[in-house]
């Protein structure tokens, strides 16, 4: 299936903020590290028929480059260094790093190359896949239907929060990867800008064009890669946390907790890290149980939870966000990142549950052992066993 009308992507910045944040850290600290990443569809969708169309879009991405106005805008942000931005100015996507195949209806994608380059593929490639699939499956759906659905949800949201103090409710758009389309995401974000509790977007292109705050720190791959970068597997998570502070000592201080489960994370998150990091991000498992563990951990360390921020971003919608806000608002600072339930929430449209995750670093396996068993990713069962042993986790979950 080919012949999509035009390139889906129009800007190098049409990606999530944490990709550039991580890329700068990789550029400075791990310039020569090599990685491999793979696509997964967690649902039962047979997406292989779109392989040719996806390959066309991958080829088109080599023409994207950082424009001068984009360069100047990034230069005005407090956390980017001139050497990285000058390098990014010359960056081009290399389609040779991407292998796209149709395996009897199953879509297979494997990315290989220097981490500093491969790191850029995940978010825009997922956005491309999502937009292509929805273009063919739902050709008559689009911005109008998405905005109608959002308005209906906002009416319910207003009723739900009528008697709540919403002054500490902060919502972010995290919807780039699985959006219905670029146009839908932009329309949704522009509508949400009218709400006092909407504080920003993870999409750098939208943040620049709509004068919003870009949101994001690091992703699972930062911790996964350190499983092979660090000489000692048992201390790899601490090495990742320390390396992040080395690059960003006073900003971008929200740590992701579920690469090797929340319990293993908290064992590594001692007083020095807990004091210096601004807060934590939830991305799998029971959010209430996770939040209670986080608050208890801060209290045990003698840190006032009200000086820290918990970011919830796992499969949220507005109603779930309000429920979590009711539960935690008086005890800790809160932010909520909603993705698919904002940017691909259209009647009769089935969002894709798709990811691209790191599977190798320097030719050796890495793994994600999240707080949701179905999100565990690794080819090498022996490495999963070694990782569980190193972090004192029970040998129960299977890698997928």
From Swiss-Prot:
One of its GO terms (cellular component) is cytosol. The modification Phosphohistidine is found at residue 220. Disulfide bonds: none annotated. Pfam families: NAPRTase (PF04095), NAPRTase_N (PF17767). Signal peptide: none annotated. Pathway: Cofactor biosynthesis; NAD(+) biosynthesis; nicotinate D-ribonucleotide from nicotinate: step 1/1. Keywords: Ligase, Phosphoprotein, Pyridine nucleotide biosynthesis. It catalyses: nicotinate + 5-phospho-alpha-D-ribose 1-diphosphate + ATP + H2O = nicotinate beta-D-ribonucleotide + ADP + phosphate + diphosphate. It is an enzyme of class 6 (ligase). Transiently phosphorylated on a His residue during the reaction cycle. Phosphorylation strongly increases the affinity for substrates and increases the rate of nicotinate D-ribonucleotide production. Dephosphorylation regenerates the low-affinity form of the enzyme, leading to product release. One of its GO terms (biological process) is NAD biosynthetic process via the salvage pathway. SUPFAM superfamilies: Nicotinate/Quinolinate PRTase C-terminal domain-like, Nicotinate/Quinolinate PRTase N-terminal domain-like. The keyword Phosphoprotein applies. InterPro entries: N/Namide_PRibTrfase, NAPRTase_N, Nic_PRibTrfase, Nic_PRibTrfase-Fam, Nicotinate_pribotase-like_C. It comes from the Bacteria. Its EC number is 6.3.4.21. GO terms for molecular function: nicotinate phosphoribosyltransferase activity. Belongs to the NAPRTase family. Catalyzes the synthesis of beta-nicotinate D-ribonucleotide from nicotinate and 5-phospho-D-ribose 1-phosphate at the expense of ATP. This is Nicotinate phosphoribosyltransferase. It comes from Salmonella paratyphi B (strain ATCC BAA-1250 / SPB7). The gene is pncB.
């Amino acid at each position: 299936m080919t012949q999509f009308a035009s390139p889906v992507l129009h800007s190098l910045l049409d990606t999530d903020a944490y990709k550039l944040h991580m890329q700068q850290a990789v550029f400075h600290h791990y310039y020569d590290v090599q990685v491999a990443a793979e696509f997964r569809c967690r649902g039962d969708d047979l997406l292989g028929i779109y392989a040719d169309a996806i390959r066309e879009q991958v080829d088109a991405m080599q023409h994207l480059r950082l424009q001068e106005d984009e360069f100047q805008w990034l230069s005005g942000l407090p956390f980017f260094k001139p050497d990285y931005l000058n390098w990014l100015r010359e960056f081009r996507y290399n389609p040779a790093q991407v292998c796209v195949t149709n395996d009897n209806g199953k879509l297979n994608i494997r990315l290989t190359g220097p981490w500093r380059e491969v790191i850029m593929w995940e978010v825009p490639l997922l956005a491309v896949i999502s937009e292509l699939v929805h273009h063919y499956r739902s050709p008559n759906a689009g911005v109008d239907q998405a905005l109608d659905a959002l308005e209906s949800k906002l009416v319910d949201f207003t009723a739900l929060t009528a008697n709540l103090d919403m002054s500490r409710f902060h919502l972010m758009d995290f919807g780039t990867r699985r959006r219905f389309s670029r146009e839908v995401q932009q329309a949704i974000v522009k509508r949400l800008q009218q709400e006092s509790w909407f504080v920003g977007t993870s999409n750098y292109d939208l943040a620049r064009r709509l004068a919003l705050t870009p949101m994001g720190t690091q992703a699972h791959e930062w911790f996964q890669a350190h499983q092979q970068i660090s000489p000692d597997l048992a201390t790899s998570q601490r090495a990742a946390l320390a390396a992040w502070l080395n690059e960003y000592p006073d900003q971008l201080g929200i740590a992701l907790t579920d690469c090797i489960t929340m319990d293993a994370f908290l064992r590594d998150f001692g007083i020095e890290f807990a004091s210096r990091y601004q807060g934590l991000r939830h991305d799998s498992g029971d959010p209430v149980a996770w939040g209670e563990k986080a608050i208890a951990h801060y209290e045990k360390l003698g840190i006032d939870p009200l000086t820290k921020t918990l970011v919830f971003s796992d499969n949220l919608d507005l109603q779930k966000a309000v429920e979590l806000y009711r539960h935690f608002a008086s005890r800790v600072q809160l932010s909520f990142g909603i993705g698919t339930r904002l940017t691909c929430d259209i009647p009769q449209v089935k969002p894709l549950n798709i990811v691209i995750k790191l599977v190798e670093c320097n030719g050796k396996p890495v793994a994600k052992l999240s707080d949701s068993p179905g999100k565990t990713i690794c080819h090498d069962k022996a490495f999963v066993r070694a990782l569980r042993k190193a972090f004192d986790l029970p040998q129960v979950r299977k890698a997928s």
